[in-house]
């Protein structure tokens, strides 16, 4: 228990970065997908060869 307490004091859980699915990051990914020249604005998708985060492959 002592070791756990020391570890939590030295490295609080808030210091651990969260996963990449945060709302602000999702919006940034969607914006970058829209600006990509391979983006199809009608289908809201891009070809599977040029897929980036926030962009759905056109199938």
Swiss-Prot record:
Main location: secreted
Disulfide bonds: 45-59, 46-55, 51-58
GO annotation, cellular component aspect: extracellular region
Tissue localization of expression: Expressed by the venom duct.
GO MF entry, a single one: toxin activity
Propeptide residue span(s): 16-44
Residues in the signal sequence: 1-15
Subcellular location: Secreted
UniProt keyword annotations, A-Z: Disulfide bond, Secreted, Signal, Toxin
Family membership: Belongs to the conotoxin M superfamily.
This protein's domain notes: The cysteine framework is III (CC-C-C-CC).
Protein name per its UniProtKB record: Conotoxin reg3.15
Species assigned in the record: Conus regius (Crown cone)
Upper classification of the organism: Eukaryota, Metazoa, Spiralia, Lophotrochozoa, Mollusca
């Amino acid at each position: 228990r002592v070791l756990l307490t020391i570890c939590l004091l030295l490295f609080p859980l808030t210091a651990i970065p969260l996963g990449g699915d945060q709302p602000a990051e999702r919006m940034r990914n969607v914006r970058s997908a829209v600006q990509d020249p391979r983006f199809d604005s009608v289908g809201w998708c891009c070809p599977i060869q040029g897929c980036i985060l926030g962009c759905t492959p056109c199938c």
